[in-house]
Amino acid sequence: MGKSKKEKQQAYFFDNKALLALILPLVVEQLLAVLVGMADSIMIASVGEAAVSGVSLVDQIMVLLINAFSALATGGAVVAGQFLGQDRREEACKSATQMVWFITICAIGITVLVYLGKSFILHTVFGKIDQDVMHHADIYLLIVAASIPFMALYNGGAAIFRTMGNSKVTMQISIIMNVINIGGNAILIYGFHRGTEGVAIPTLVSRMTAAIIIIALLCDEKRTLHIERTWRYRINWEMVKKILSIGVPNGLENSMFQLGKIIVLSLVSTFGTYAIAANAVSNAIALFQILPGMAITLAITPVISRCVGAGDYEQAKYYNKKLMLITYVSMTAMVLFIFSLLPFILKAYNLSDLTAKTTADIIHFHGIGAIFIWPVAFSLPATFRAAGDAKACMYISSISMWIFRIGFSYVLGKYMGMGVFGIWVAMVIDWVFRAMCFVIRYFKGSWKKNAIV
């Protein structure tokens, strides 16, 4: 006798209600991050241009570190998720504990290196900058560097909660963190006139608070995944190697992506003030266009890793198809919504006619690319990583970025005279190449041969 429809639905790891409960808080979390980032920028601007520049320089390093910790956290999440798929809860908890300890030790080591190399970072990495900018960067780095271990702990903890299918907790902690950050900024900048310190201190306090809350919650043994309550940590190299097999390729991919953005930004600056402004505004608006996709991509890891752990690739394909469809629908809705608001958004920025026209062209072009290409170029590889196929993602993404995103930016933007618009065209060409490679790999089934537990 075949299974009834109800029995088949019960065999699925995530029903529609569970998927919705996983995705919606992630969308809210991503939206908060973008909105708070914008509010942060406005508050910092009130301190002065030198403060904006100094904070921005240090934040570029912080973004690199956040990417590295997120990659390690993803590695731990994939390992724990695959163990859960095999109903090996004890091993899943051990992998979560190993990831949290390992990521913390790495973060403490990086923090020590940042403090020891502070002078090198300020004078060599940042190059020749004005003394005023250097002063603000120095103050900000001195305070914010202390938040590195807490930032790592939060990233690790958030990944574990998502693996359990519980993104509501991370959303709630994110709200607390952002309230502390924005509230602290407002009080210290506008109330006590602390300048750059007023920006840095709330960042440190909010990250400390988030880390303490998430680790306290993870020590609850009633949870599906929890960490051991002990200060005696013994490294399990076999487990750590599994985590690193995902974390290292993913981290290198993220870091190179960030490096590519910096290289392209240096090219944009050669096109003049209007191009810099158009690019900055376009980046801010474009982030909203892909926001649902970024949230759903985070949801893919716990869902697919559970299926792969169980050896159920049919279910993995089912969820991949379902989540990709949700990504396409939600991104289409968001892009069309942004298109409808674009005239009002551009008016609010008070741009010159040339800058406004260039920005509108970029946003329309980016939006169309986001609807048709972005999900396959960025959400589909999340399925591969969850299946243990992180190296292939790294190779494809790195080759595509250097040849198309960076190489074609110079060809189209500089040599063919397309300016800043050419850089965005090059970016979408990069998406097309990635999408083609990932679709071919998906249908060939190569990604199914890399389960790590």
Predicted segment positions?
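Short alpha-helical transmembrane segments in multi-pass integral membrane proteins
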Residues: 1-25, 80-147, 180, 191-248, ...
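Helix-terminus/linker motif at the lipid-water interface of multi-pass membrane proteins
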Residues: 31, 35-53, 122-131, 187-194, ...
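Transmembrane helical elements of multi-pass membrane transporters/channels
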Residues: 21-40, 143, 206-210, 214, ...
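Short runs within selected transmembrane alpha-helices of multi-pass transporters and secretion channels
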Residues: 73, 143-162, 170-181, 199-214, ...
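Transmembrane alpha-helix boundary and packing residues in multipass membrane permease domains
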Residues: 26, 30, 41-42, 78, ...
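Small-residue-rich hydrophobic transmembrane alpha-helices
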Residues: 52-112, 151-170, 265, 276-342, ...
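Interfacial/gating helices of multi-pass transporter permease domains
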Residues: 21, 44-63, 131-136, 196-197, ...
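N-terminal transmembrane alpha-helices
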Residues: 11-42, 46-47, 63-75, 79, ...
